[in-house]
């Protein structure tokens, strides 16, 4: 994880020495290479998640056939188990990102047979709130801007995004006007947020990278992923729907 309060600081996971406690979290200075202990690991944990302030609040591991995951309240916290599930079971969960409040986090979990987006609280993780589900398609993953979850993506006949943030939705609409007929993806932005690195693609257009001025809406192409691949060499994408052998409709 990058750290908002330190441009040279990152959090990294290391296994074994010098902690000898499985995976643990360390703070590293990328300019000097110096590391120091941040959050000590414990048995069976394989992955930690830190919020934008660098506080490790979630951990996930393995215990036999189950995947327990737990949460804490900050440095020196006592960890407690939040849930235990089978990796491919209907109750499996996938961490997406932290919410606006320190104790909130987004996760993907089943709803009516489809993967959906939920908002949970570390204080009451067993009663999450459903934020978005689609009757036909699984939610595929988060849309992250500046390490914030601003929406979730899903794939129908075309890529789609359900935004949770009005400012992000307005910015996405501006980018779509900038690259009409293409699907824009925000890759990165300048520190002041005015210059945007955007990846635009379509079924008959290989990815193109543009530098977009947010204030003026002007853009210029800076790179093409496949410059020798023309649109006349690509086919238009069409949705296909058919019934499976058991009668279920496959979108």
Spans of features found by a protein language model:
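Peripheral, non-catalytic segments that deliver or gate enzyme domains
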Residues: 1-251
